[in-house]
Amino acid sequence: MKNLAIFDLDNTLINTDSDHAWPQYLIKKGLVDAAETEAQNEKFYRDYQNGCLDIDAFLKFHLAPLARYSKEELAEFHREFMAEYIIPHISPMQRMLVQSHQMAGDETLVISSTNEFIITPVCHLFGITNIIGTQLETGSDGRYTGNYIGTPSLKEGKITRLNQWLAERGETLQSYGKTYFYSDSKNDLPLLRLVSEPVAVNPDAELEKEAKEKGWPVLNFK
């Protein structure tokens, strides 16, 4: 029976938060108002860390710049972003973790609250093609509208989106032998409690506390 290995992305497979880093890249490029974007970015990041993020307000802020450029321009920006802000924050151990599951024949999947535009090329670095992120709306002109569609994959939303993905494949979690989920954040406790093999990676204080209480493995890649 095949196993399913699910990974969070930010601060789990990469030692940074791509959602937080993207506005920093836009500021550096001079593509957004620096002071306003920095203030908003830091506020939303604190809220996320504290488990009280207003996902609608955050996505309105975070997705607006995507609507200003063509997908070709955004792809070029993303290549620069990856080289400067993402690749330097991936350790050999994180790559080896994914490879160990791939070599064992496990199905691998990333579920992230970060949007698909940002996470898809990052997941491809790990050879992961099953990717669930917050979905973006595309207009009739082929550009992103700045809106999202469906359920954002945050907190319980990760379970909703996982179940949708499984249903599309004619599966449930019970279709797999072991189900792993690797995450750093207390925001992911709903899904961590659902799988058979929860693993805390670079955990925040609340997740580390629960992991120790329940005997979950704890990995540190930072």
Curated annotation (Swiss-Prot):
Top enzyme category: hydrolase
Keywords: Amino-acid biosynthesis, Histidine biosynthesis, Hydrolase, Magnesium, Metal-binding
Active-site residues, record numbering mapped to chain: 8, 10
Domain of life: Bacteria
Catalytic activity annotation: L-histidinol phosphate + H2O = L-histidinol + phosphate
Disruption phenotype: Deletion mutant is histidine auxotroph. Complementation of the mutant with hisB from E.coli restored growth on M9 without added histidine.
Family: Belongs to the HAD-like hydrolase superfamily. SerB family.
Official protein name in the record: Histidinol-phosphatase
Organism: Neisseria meningitidis serogroup C (strain 8013)
